[in-house]
Amino acid sequence: IAYKGEADLQVVMKDDVTEVDEVVVTGIFKKAKESYTGAVTTITAKDLAMVGNRNVLSSIRNIDPSFNIVDDINMGSDPNRLPNITVRGTASMDVSMRELQSENQDDKISPNLPLFIMDGFEISLQQMMDLDESRVESITLLKDASATAMYGTRGANGVVVITTKRPEAGRLTVYYRGSLNIEAPDLTSYNLMNAREKLMFEKAAGLYTTENASSEQSLIDLYNSRLKEVERGVDTYWLKYPVRTGVGHRHSLSLEGGSEDFRYSVGLGYNNVAGAMKGSERNTFNGNMFFSYQYKQFRFQNDLQVTFNTAKNSPYGNFSEYGQVNSYFKPYDDEGNLLMILEDYVYSSMGTLNSVNLVYNPLWNAYLPSIDEEKYTQIRNNFAMEWTIMPGFVFRGRFSVSKQHDRSDKYISAK
């Protein structure tokens, strides 16, 4: 608009609405969202960044409530335990996670596990858990029968389609992202009896009475022994011993660039997850190299991925063990020495005293020299080719090869 010295200048603006075409990525094709009739949820990289968590799976759960991860409170939020995931409900046949084995690894899997597809290639639950979140462009959850129609029975439990970021044409660009992750134990839901309440409850339930006259005095002595400890002020809150506030960190660095015909990217990632159980930790190193080349009607792309993972399990054992120890037992003697055996006899269900069933201190093994860790190295290469024969008619071919080496080290002291 040219200004020529007018006292009043009236400018009329015209509306110019620009809409972004929304599509549904099924892993096989892209379809306009308004024409797709299936139940679907699309999660963008921006959504993941807002709810960043220990891994991609936890982030998806925080965004979409239909992606349900069953918490195993007995394991104390173990960062090395593969989660039990459901998208379309549970199977009618109750099968334990321990009863099924993965085809490619020793992972414990669930019959309700959805299918994971990344850039057109199937990946395992372990690969999904260790995926570098900064590489993800979008995630699409296919939840209904349309997933079965496309993927067969493998998609009956739902399909999670991951699309990774592709480099943009232009000069070399460097990206870095870092974040902290805090794992804090929440014990507020455990409303446990204190030592006196537990002992009184056992007495009211008849644990210290019997019709066997030969065991009656022994039961009275057992009760008095425990009551003596309670009167001395013993009231142990066992749940506090194996847990901590774990602080982890995550870093990712990528370089990308290229022209319209040839594009490339190189990325490195590191994710450290410190579990709420003392000593539990998961360290994952990721590296990837991608290139894409367009020649007339042909497009070639190759994605090389390398993953190094080290998982350290807690020497404190299962969290559930500490919730089962009576609070009238103390972990240390009067001189501050850790006790191996908390009590050397217990009342059996047969109405007699049994000196064989000892009550062991769950803290004992945690203070002994031990090693319990698992490592794996995986190299995976995905190659894809597209030939656009004519507009709307495209021939696609994909080839994937992977190799994984697993190692497990476990040492328990003879003590």
Regions found by a protein language model. Give the residues of each.
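Periplasmic N-terminal soluble interaction domains immediately after the signal peptide in Gram-negative
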Residues: I1-E22, L142, S146, G152-N157, ...
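Short, acidic, small-residue-rich periplasmic hinge/interaction motif at the N-terminus
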Residues: A2-A49, L57
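Flexible glycine-/small-residue-rich
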Residues: M13-D15, V24-F29, D71, V87-A91, ...
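Short, polar/charged loop or turn motifs at beta-strand boundaries
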Residues: A39-I63, D71-S77, I85-S92, D119-Q127
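Residues embedded in well-ordered regular secondary structure
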Residues: V51, I63-T86, M93-S110, P114, ...
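Short acidic/polar hinge/loop motifs at secondary-structure boundaries
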Residues: S58, E103-I109, L113-P114, D119-S146
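Non-catalytic regulatory/gating segments with a bias toward low-complexity or hydrophobic composition
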Residues: I60, F67, I139-T140, V160-I162
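Transmembrane beta-barrel strand/turn architecture of Gram-negative outer membrane proteins
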Residues: R135-S138, G155-E183, S259-I341, I371-D406
